[in-house]
Amino acid sequence: MSIMKRESLPEEYIPYIRHVNQHVIALNSRCLMTVMAVEGVNFDTADINHLNSLHNQLNTLLRNIADERVALYSHIIRRRETIYPESRFFSSFAATLDEKYKKKMVSQELYRNDLFVSLLWNPTSGKTEQLASFFQRLTKAKKTQSEPDMEAIRKIEELSQDLIQGLESYEARLLSVYAHEGILFSEQSEFLHQLVGGRRERIPLTFGTIASTIYSDRVIFGKEMIEIRHESNERFVGMFGWKEYPSKTRPGMTDGLLTAPFEFILTQSFVFKSKAAARVIMGRKQNQMINAADRASSQIDALDEALDDLESNRFVLGEHHLSLAVFADQPKTLVEYLSKARAHLTNGGAVIAREDLGLEAAWWAQLPGNFSYRARSGAITSRNFAALSPFHSFPIGKLEGNVWGAAVALLKTQAGSPYYFNFHYGDLGNTFVCGPSGSGKTVIVNFLLAQLQKHNPTMVFFDKDQGAEIFVRAGGGKYKPLKNGQPTGIAPLKGMEYTEKNKIFLRSWVLKLVTTEGQTVTEQERQDIAKAINSLESLPHAQRSLGALQLFFDNTSKEGIAIRLQRWIKGNDLGWVFDNDQDDLNLDSQFIGYDMTDFLDNEEIRRPLMMYLFNRILDLIDGRRIIIVIDEFWKALEDDSFKAFAQDRLKTIRKQNGMMLFATQSPKDALNSTIAHTIIEQCPTQIFFPNQKANYKDYVEDFKLTEREFELIQSELSRESRRFLIKQGQNSVVAELNLRGMNDEIAILSGTTKNIELVNQIINDYGADPDTWLPIFHQRRENQ
C-alpha cells in the first residue's frame, strides 16, 4: 500500500474556534459544543436485566433531549496505558516489591477505553428551518469570531446538565479548563487532539484558534491508509465504515472491540430528526417496499409498528454514522489489526466497508460538527443508537486525586486493561475482604498493604495464626505474638498517663479483671477501685503494678476485690498477662502487628486484653493516616470491646483520616454478627475471591452482589487464576495480581509455619533490621 502525499491545512477541516467559557466551545458554523467524559458501566459483571434496563433508560434520555437543533457524538478511544502510580516507600521491602512489580506491569500490553459524548447545539436555526439543510452548510460556513448568543450558551449548558444527570449511572462529567503548574489547559482540546492526531498530550489554552492548536502532527492520506507523523515516530491508520445496517440491534454489539489488542477510535454520531422528518423517512421506506412488491411483508408490518411507536414517542429518529479507525506502528501490523477489527464489527450482522476513496472524509468525520463529511450515514431510532453506543466499558479506577493521593496499586483486569486500585471510595476507605483458604487472599491483602506504604500511614495489623508476621517484620514493623503462658509485655497500669480520661478507663478495666460476664458490681466497689487508681498515681512509675494496686483494697473479705485480683498478679496463674515490668505495645512504630490467636477462644483473658489494646489504638486515631487491619475479624467480633470499637469507628474513622480492613474466609462469619449491617454499609470497598461453595443468600441477598457477580465468584473464576472481584459502590471489576517469578516476595507476603520459624531464628542471631535478615532468609529458604 502506497502513501500518497496529500496534506491539508487544519482550518479547512477542523471547525473549532475557541472556548466561550470553561465548558463550551464555539465552532466556525456558530454551533456550540460541550464534551463529557463517561466512565461507563462494566458489562462483564452486570446482570443482563440491568443492562437491558440501562438500555431503556438511555432511550428515554435521548427522547427527553430530542430537538432538531441537537446532535450527539459518542467516541471510544482505546489506547495503550503505560502510567504507573507514583511511589515512595518507608520500607526497603515495599520499595523492592514495587520496583519488581512495576517492571513486570509496564512491560505488558495494557489498554484502556476512554468514553466521551459530545453535545452540539445550533443556536441560529429557527423553528421553521430544517436542521438537515443547516447541517449541510456547517463546514462551508466562514470562520467567525462573533460573540455567541448568550441564550444559546444558556441552552447548551442546560442540555449538558440534563445529559449529565441522565448519565448518572455511567458517571459522566463535563470536560473543562484546568490549571497545571500555573498554566491553563483545555480538556476539550486534548480530546479533540486525539481525534485529529491519534495521540494524547496536554493542550494549553492559546490566543489562536483551537483548530491550529490541536493540529500538531502531520496527517497524510493515502489510498487505503493514513500516515500520522510525529517528530519522534510515525503511525499508520486504516478505517472501516458501516455500509449497511444490521436488521436488529442489541446492547453490546461492539463490546468485542473493548478487549482488542490494538488502539482504535470508534466514532458514532446521531443527529436528531423532527417527528415530521421522521415520518417522511419511514413512509418513504415503506412505499419503496410496497412498490417493489417486496415479499417480506413482516418488514412492512414492522415499519407500521415502528410508525406507531414514533407517534407514541417510544423512540425518536436520527441520522447516524459509525466509523472505526485502527492504529498500528507498521503497515504490516495494521493489516493484522484490521482483520481482527473487521470480525468484531461484523459480529452484529452489519456490512462494513474499508475506507479508500472516502478515507480522508471519514477521518475528518470523526470530529464532532463535521456533519458533511459523513459519507456513510443512515436513519436509525434512538433505541438503535442506545444499543450501538451503550457506554459499556471496564472500570479503570482512579490514578490521581484520591483522598490519600496517587492510586495504591496498578492491577490488571480480566479484560487486559489497567485498574488503579484505591481502598477509598469517595472519602470512605473501609474495606471488606472475603476468600476461602488457598484463594490467594493473604498474598493480595498484604501486597496492597505494602503498596499502601507509599502514603506513609500508621498500620496496625491484628493477625491470626501469625500469617502476616514475616510481612510485618519485613516492612520494618514490630510484631508481638501473644502466647498463652508467656509474658505479654503488657502492663496497663504502667503504660498509660494518669489523666482523668485514662483513669476512668483504668477503673473500667480493673472491673473487667475482677468481674465475670453478668456479675453485679456494687457502688462501693466502684468507689474503692477509683480510690486505688488515684493512690497508685502517687507511686513511682516502675512500682505501678497490679500487686501494688491490690494493697489499696481490703484483703480481709474472701470475695473482695483484693482476692479476685490475686490471680492476675505476677507469680499467679494469670500474672503473665498484665503484671509485667513494662508496657511495650510498640505504639511508637509506624507498622505494628499483634497475633492474638491463642486468646480468641479464652474469654477471660480476651475481654480485658482487647479492651486495653483497642483503647490504646484509639489514641493513634488522631488525624494521622492510619489503617487498622483485622484478619478473621468475626472471631474478634465475639468480644464486646471490639464490637463496640468496630461499630463506632467504622462510622467515624474517615473523619480522622483513617480506615479499617476486615478479612474473613466466609461472608457468613460477618453476617452472623449483630453489627453485620454496619459492616456492609460502612465498607464500600469489597473484595471477593473465588469460592465454589459460595452461598447465594450470603452473597446476593445479604451482600447485594449481582447474580452475575455471584456467578463469577462461584463458578467462572478459578483459584489458580489469582483473579478476584473488586466491588466499590455499584461498580465492580475482575482483577488479577500476577507475581509469577517473584518467589522471594511471595515468601514474605504469605508466611508458612516453617518460614516463620526460620525468620525468628535469623532475627535472634542477626537482629530485627530487615535489610540485614532478609537476604539471609532468602538464601536459607532456597537451600532448605
From Swiss-Prot:
Organism: Bartonella quintana (strain Toulouse)
PANTHER family per the UniProt record, alphabetical: TYPE IV SECRETION SYSTEM PROTEIN CAGE (PTHR30121:SF12), UNCHARACTERIZED PROTEIN YJGR-RELATED (PTHR30121)
Purpose: Component of the type IV secretion system VirB/VirD4 which could be a major virulence determinant for subversion of human endothelial cell (HEC) function. Altogether with virB11, may be implicated in providing the energy, via hydrolysis of ATP, for the assembly of secretion system and substrate transport.
Subunit structure, interactors included: Interacts with virB10.
Predominant cellular place of this UniProt entry's protein: membrane
GO molecular function, one term: ATP binding
UniProt KW keywords: ATP-binding, Cell inner membrane, Cell membrane, Membrane, Nucleotide-binding, Transport, Virulence
Family, per entry: Belongs to the TrbE/VirB4 family.
Pfam family, one: P-loop_TraG
GO annotations of cellular component type: plasma membrane
UniProt-listed Gene3D superfamilies: P-loop containing nucleotide triphosphate hydrolases
Subcellular location, record wording: Cell inner membrane
Identification of the protein by name: Type IV secretion system protein virB4
Residues annotated for ATP binding in this entry: G435, P436, S437, G438, S439, G440, K441, T442
Entry-linked InterPro entries: AAA+_ATPase (IPR003593), CagE_TrbE_VirB (IPR004346), CagE_TrbE_VirB_cntrl_dom (IPR018145), P-loop_NTPase (IPR027417), P-loop_TraG (IPR043964), T4SS_component (IPR051162)
